[in-house]
């Protein structure tokens, strides 16, 4: 049997010999490591493995019965915690979830009570939240109160959740058992191809019961997101202008934002959104303060589907200190970071973009892509579109502005994209989205620019925030030093 068996000495025997006072029937049965222990009292114990396993409400996906209550305790081995996420959730909503509910107790001070339907404003559905135990165990309580009308509800099917054991301080990693004589040890793995370990090696578990690196005695390696490598890469197109419809997975870092209006952004890591400062503090005298309602949607190319997936609440908004909202002709410092309340689960439709590390990614004539949900031919689009555009010579953009007697600041912290006589399909609603180029050395897509400003929609150049100029600031913010 694979998994954690053999990793925790004596745990196996103690589980098999442990008395179960709540099970008074010979119908009770045990199967170790992740299989349900069922009792007539509807109390159960699940032992988490490193691979995700399913937990559902009784009868799922059929409508659940009214008048039942069940308690499920999920336990992880020493040195691991339990992580639980909901893939589907559909319970009858009620005020404060006093009716049908799922209650999650992670070992902290407060339990979380959930109800309603995923994506609905009614009740308190789990959305994208991850529930991670503070210790080795997590309890899920499912309650379906009796109904005077019928024992069956024909509207609500219950829930489907995934649970797994994760190494402490390593929320996105898996481990593989190595059952050799001596101290237990594991070979660390991350969830390919979306995460990678920041170090490699075999971990051992000495008598202190703390996992250590066998080479240097360090702590469990951290799994970090893999950036700039879409599972569904773009098909190679000729150097033509205009916009095209993106396929699901082409631009998995694309964010759709709703603040003062629609805008864009890009996922960094699994918790940050890179965007333009002017989407938060618009260059308009009527907007004196930042809108408190900042919504972020991720994981799809269709706005209707994005709304169904739900908003990712924002914990913190950080705007670059050089940005001046009241200077309408100066977009210097037009960059901001949004920290999400919860880490997002990465997958084929949701992956981060990489950040630049050298000037060669800004050479004139280098082709890149910009994507967004902005205006197209005068209409708001509901589908993600993208355009292929070249980095333009700086002198050409300066001359173009001078010919039109424009007074906008074109600083060294900006660059321009496009060609003077060709169509520039970037327009209102694309602000905050990123311009990406392919890094031939690192073999990944890099966000070199942020859609910042332009002169109308149509022909001509677009002007972008140069991300490389702000890399030190980005690192300080993400590391909590700014």
Swiss-Prot record:
InterPro entries: CUB_dom, Peptidase_S1_PA, Peptidase_S1_PA_chymotrypsin, Peptidase_S1A, Sperma_CUB_dom_sf, Trypsin_dom, TRYPSIN_SER. It comes from the Eukaryota. Residues 44-166 form the CUB domain. SUPFAM superfamilies: Spermadhesin, CUB domain, Trypsin-like serine proteases. Residues 240-479 form the Peptidase S1 domain. Expressed in liver (at protein level). Keywords: Complement pathway, Disulfide bond, Glycoprotein, Hydrolase, Immunity, Innate immunity, Protease, Secreted, Serine protease, Signal, Sushi. Residues 1-43 form the signal peptide. Glycans are attached at residue 358. GO terms for biological process: complement activation, classical pathway; innate immune response; proteolysis. Mediates the proteolytic cleavage of HP/haptoglobin in the endoplasmic reticulum. This is Complement C1r subcomponent-like protein. It comes from Mus musculus. The gene is C1rl.
């Amino acid at each position: 049997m694979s998994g954690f068996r053999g990793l925790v000495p004596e745990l196996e025997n103690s589980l098999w010999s442990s008395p179960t006072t709540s099970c008074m029937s010979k119908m009770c049965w045990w199967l170790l490591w992740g299989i349900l222990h069922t009792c007539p009292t509807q109390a159960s114990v699940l032992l988490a493995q490193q691979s995700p396993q399913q937990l559902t409400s009784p009868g799922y996906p059929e409508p659940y019965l009214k008048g039942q209550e069940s308690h499920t305790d999920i336990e992880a081995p020493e040195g691991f915690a339990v992580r639980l996420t909901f893939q589907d959730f559909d319970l009858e909503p009620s005020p404060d979830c006093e009716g049908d509910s799922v209650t999650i107790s992670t070992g902290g001070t407060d339990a979380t009570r959930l109800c309603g339907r995923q994506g609905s404003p009614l009740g308190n559905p789990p959305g994208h939240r991850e529930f991670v135990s503070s210790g080795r165990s997590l309890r899920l309580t499912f309650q379906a109160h009796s109904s005077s009308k019928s024992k069956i509800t024909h509207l609500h099917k219950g829930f489907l959740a995934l649970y797994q054991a994760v190494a402490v301080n390593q929320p996105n990693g898996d481990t593989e058992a190595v059952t050799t004589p001596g101290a237990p040890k594991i070979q660390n793995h991350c969830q390919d191809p979306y995460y990678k370990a920041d170090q490699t090696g075999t971990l051992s578990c000495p008598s202190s019961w703390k996992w250590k690196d066998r080479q240097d005695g360090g702590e469990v390696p951290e799994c970090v997101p893999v950036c700039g490598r879409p599972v569904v890469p773009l098909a190679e197109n000729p150097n033509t202008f205009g916009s095209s419809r993106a396929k699901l997975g082409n631009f998995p870092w694309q964010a759709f934002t709703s603040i003062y209006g629609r805008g864009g952004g890009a996922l960094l890591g699994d918790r940050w959104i890179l965007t333009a400062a002017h989407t938060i503090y618009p260059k308009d005298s009527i907007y004196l303060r930042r809108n408190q309602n900042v919504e972020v949607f991720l994981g799809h190319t269709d706005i209707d589907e994005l709304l169904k997936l739900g908003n990712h609440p924002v914990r913190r908004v950080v705007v670059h200190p050089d940005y001046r909202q009241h200077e309408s002709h100066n977009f210097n410092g037009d960059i901001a970071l949004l920290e999400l309340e919860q880490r997002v689960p990465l997958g084929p439709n949701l992956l981060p973009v990489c950040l630049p590390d050298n000037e060669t990614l800004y050479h004139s004539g280098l082709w890149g892509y910009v994507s967004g949900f902005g205006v197209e031919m005068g209409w708001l689009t509901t589908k993600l579109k993208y355009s292929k555009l070249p980095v333009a010579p700086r002198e050409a953009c300066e001359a173009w502005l001078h010919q039109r007697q424009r007074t906008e600041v074109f600083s060294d912290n900006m660059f321009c994209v496009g060609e003077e006589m060709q169509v520039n399909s970037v327009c209102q609603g694309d602000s905050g989205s990123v311009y990406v180029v392919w890094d031939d050395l690192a073999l990944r897509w890099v966000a070199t620019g942020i859609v910042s400003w332009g002169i109308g929609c149509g022909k001509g150049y677009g002007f972008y925030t140069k991300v490389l100029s702000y890399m030190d600031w980005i690192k300080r913010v993400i590391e909590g030093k700014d």
